[in-house]
Amino acid sequence: MLFRWCPLVALAIASGTAATEQSWESSPYYPSPWTKGEGEWEAAYQKAVSFVSQLTLDEKVNLTTGVGWMQESCVGQVGSIPRLGFRSLCMQDGPLGIRFGTEARMDIFLYLTCNTNFYLPYVGDYVTAFPAGINVAATWSRELAYLRGKAMGEEFRGKGADVILGPAIGPIGRAPEGGRNWEGLGPDPVLAGKLVAETIKGMQKSGVIACAKHFIANEQERFRIAAEAQGYGFDIAESISSNVDDVTMHEIYLWPFADAVKAGVGSIMCSYNQINNSYGCGNSYTQNKLLKGELGFRGFIMSDWQAHHSGVGSAFAGLDMSMPGDTLFGTGVSYWGANLTIAVANGTIPEWRVDDMAVRIMAAYYKVGRDQVQVPINFNSWTTDVEGYQHALVKEGYGVVNQRVNVRDHHAQIARRVARDSTVLLKNKGVLPLTGTEQFTAIIGEDAGPNINGPNSCPDRGCDNGTLAMGWGSGTTNFPYLVTPDDAIQREIVGKGVGNVMSVLQNGDFKNIQAVAGQADVALVFINSDSGEGYISVDGNEGDRKNLTTWKGGDEMVKQVTSVCNNTVLVIHSSGPILAGQWHDNPNITAILWAGLPGQESGNALVDILYGKENPGGKSPFTWGRAAEDYGTTILREPNNGKGAPQHLFSEGIMFEYRHFDQKNITPVYEFGYGLSYTTFSYSDLRVRPMRANKYVPATGMTKPAPRLGHSSTKYADYLFPGGFKGVTKYVYPWLTSTDPKEASGDKNYGMPLEDYVPPNANNGDAQPVLPASGVPGGNPGLFEDLYEVSAVITNDGDRVGEEVPQLVRNLSFFPPILS
């Protein structure tokens, strides 16, 4: 695959052993690897060791444990270390920009907290609403991925956030109905890996820590959280298990994370789902062996919010930070906090494991230069009022919580460029670009116009009202404004002062639709398909899409227009592919554009393409099938294991999406990587040159023993709440309420024999064998050796400036062929 400003790189397609029916269990792997300093991590590691060496046990625990849901300004914060002047680290959503104000995992959060005292503001706080990750994938541009990441990083830094909860590379998009596919970078692991690496570099260049998520095999919303599924009427007690074979894990789901680690990502978020029947944040195989062992990840693993299911077990399994800190939202009870303090004091967890957690957190902090660019936290996730409660959950600490700092700078230009360059021209019978001087232009469809209640009126964008510019869920942000296609197109035409333009912005108003479209020289018809996170249901779509059809009767609206207008231009806003089979080859549809989820600059970016101000250069980041069955994969829609964890077998192995279409010889409507242009390109002088790649050498040897940075007291009395200290209600602290550890822990099972819950070798801090697949951050260096250089002379033969994205698909000869 080629990225616009880079040499050609080949995408290898290989067959692998598919998963088969069996009992799926995740193999244990202990101890949790301790980090070390090397390469670009060396200086940060040394600073981290120096800092952590000064800490008491309770201060180390404070670094690892969130203070509780809605207890501070950010969606997640750990404790502070006042003695050293170290403020609480701020974790903030999300992958499209700074999310706050509506903070609305409402369905599940209100259910769990019984808290109805939420204020739902509808305004943005001087931040940019960027295009979605799937749009970045459609640009195939490392440059734009970097620029978007850097702009985001600058905004988070300006608001005082330390960690961006993004970018997303899980879900990768195994099933086209997946609710959060749009947050990620598409279903090809090479494309996703290259672009996530540049996004991370941009974010961290700005002085904030990127958090790549969701690790791993997190491919659907349904059943991801048992309590959430219960709210939808499913009687299950455990989250879904994604059952994945090792080849598929490495070649598909782990690959983009390898690129993220190689790029120096500071944090990775573990996921809600189980992997081979072990929860993501307590899975020692995926966290200890794959991520910290094979990939050599030097940063810290953070739990998704309430994806933390155990205390001692998750610590041994590699989790480094618990978010938001409480076991259930608003309880003030934590698996860690005081319980982690007790577990170290009584010898259950060796102190070196907590040292390693703290060093990993601080190494990421120093690596991106957080100590050099500190900005006070100047926003609040729970209200956009200037004044409010610092501890919103319990309504304590009233004062100024929002300073309304404008952090946007020139970022609207970057957002517009990404939205524009990600627009994919799927069909053109010579009608595009338009001139703006057409005699009569009709604009048809709700998706062209505004949400009459405002673009932020639905919490976390949990509706499909007006034009679709982002999906829904925690990965959203508030729009500072939203330029609708209707506004931008009308402005373009009226500015020319020649043609008429008329809009009908109700999909079902067939009488007026036909009356207007029947007079038009060109009818611009807008359709969409939305999706999002599982805590919000929109029209029965509980995060994941129910189907791949258009929403709000879009197909029928297209039929109504094309029956009276022979020059219909179709514009699609969607979170993924839709079924285009019934209209893509309609002769009265003269052009089709996919604009994805373009963010705040939606209309402006579209006008740039429609009216030829810029050449369309986007390439489809997914395959467009003729039927849902063409994909060969879908989400699991019904429980299949009684009340236990639904079992989702990834039986296709690596053969999903375009690989499946190729293997099964299924002709799609539009291929992965497809996209037309207003100009033409010719290829010549194609050359393939073998590179002098180094021989693959498995890593060998032993690690050093686990660094021990402190010898803390084992006396429980040393960890009691400080005398005279007045705490915040339901706040998670590292201190004990009693010298009786069972009473202080609140754990009815306290005192169980260690052999009943501490896995063999988990507390072994001796030198350990180096994994053969390891070597440097990202994995064995042999993974990144260039085998061939492919070059060509590409000539623009047309009369317009444009960009081309050459693509090369190579079937490796030592695997069974999958292409005929």
Curated annotation (Swiss-Prot):
It comes from the Eukaryota. It is found in: Secreted. Gene3D superfamilies: Glycoside hydrolase family 3 C-terminal domain, Glycoside hydrolase, family 3, N-terminal domain. The active site is at 304. GO terms for biological process: cellulose catabolic process. It is an enzyme of class 3 (hydrolase). Its EC number is 3.2.1.21. Glycans are attached at residues 62, 276, 339, 346, 465, 547, 566, 588, 811. Keywords: Allergen, Carbohydrate metabolism, Glycoprotein, Glycosidase, Hydrolase, Polysaccharide degradation, Secreted, Signal. Residues 1-18 form the signal peptide. One of its GO terms (cellular component) is extracellular region. One of its GO terms (molecular function) is beta-glucosidase activity. Belongs to the glycosyl hydrolase 3 family. Beta-glucosidases are one of a number of cellulolytic enzymes involved in the degradation of cellulosic biomass. Catalyzes the last step releasing glucose from the inhibitory cellobiose. This is Probable beta-glucosidase ARB_05654. It comes from Arthroderma benhamiae (strain ATCC MYA-4681 / CBS 112371). The lineage of its organism: Eukaryota, Fungi, Dikarya, Ascomycota, Pezizomycotina.
